[in-house]
Structure formats: C-alpha cells, structure tokens
Amino acid sequence: MGSLSPWHWAILAVVVIVLFGAKKLPDAARSLGKSLRIFKSEVRELQNENKAEASIETPTPVQSQRVDPSAASGQDSTEARPA
C-alpha cells in the first residue's frame, strides 16, 4: 500500500491524455519547462546577489570628537571677551 503499481500509472496516463488531449500535452510540457527554466535563473540570480552583498565590506562608523572652541583658537578661557 502507498506505492503505485504499473497499472495505476497506465490508468493515470490514459486519464491525463483523455482530459487534456494529445495536442495540448506537448504545449503543457513546453510551458512547464520554460517556467522551470525561468525559476532556476531567478534563484541563481538571487544567490549571486546575496554573495555580492556579503562580499561588500560594511563601512566603519566615523568617530566624532568634541573640540572645545576656546582651546582650539588658542585663547585662554580667563581672558575677557569683547562685547
């Protein structure tokens, strides 16, 4: 039980031929082949895209430093400022 005997496959083939007709079966197989080819190419493209993204280095974050304006200009903070 569970496996199909050759008789089951033969009956299934006859039913498919009767339902779809002999002329439509090659067209259906051709269409299925094209669809699988397109699907495979899209999967391959996505894999290449992921590999390209992984190979790109992530930029290092810029470290900001706080500069005291009075120390940067060379003036002492005790000097009087003009009004």
Swiss-Prot record:
Q: What is this protein called?
A: Sec-independent protein translocase protein TatA
Q: Which UniProt keywords apply?
A: Cell membrane, Membrane, Protein transport, Translocation, Transmembrane, Transmembrane helix, Transport
Its domain of life reads Bacteria
Subunit structure of this entry?
Answer: The Tat system comprises two distinct complexes: a TatABC complex, containing multiple copies of TatA, TatB and TatC subunits, and a separate TatA complex, containing only TatA subunits. Substrates initially bind to the TatABC complex, which probably triggers association of the separate TatA complex to form the active translocon.
List the GO molecular function terms: protein transmembrane transporter activity
Where does this protein have compositionally biased stretches of type Polar residues?
Answer: 57-77
* Membrane-crossing segments per the record: 1-21
Membrane topology category = Single-pass membrane protein
UniProt xrefs under Pfam families = TatA_B_E
* Chain residue ranges for the region called Disordered: 48-83
GO biological process terms, semicolon-separated: protein transport by the Tat complex
Q: Name one GO cellular component term.
A: TAT protein transport complex
**Phenotype seen when the gene is deleted:** Essential for growth.
PANTHER family in UniProt: SEC-INDEPENDENT PROTEIN TRANSLOCASE PROTEIN TATA
- Write out the function statement from the record: Part of the twin-arginine translocation (Tat) system that transports large folded proteins containing a characteristic twin-arginine motif in their signal peptide across membranes. TatA could form the protein-conducting channel of the Tat system.
InterPro entries registered for this protein in UniProt: TatA/B/E (IPR003369), TatA/E (IPR006312)
The family annotation for this protein states: Belongs to the TatA/E family.
Where in the cell does this protein reside?
Answer: Cell membrane
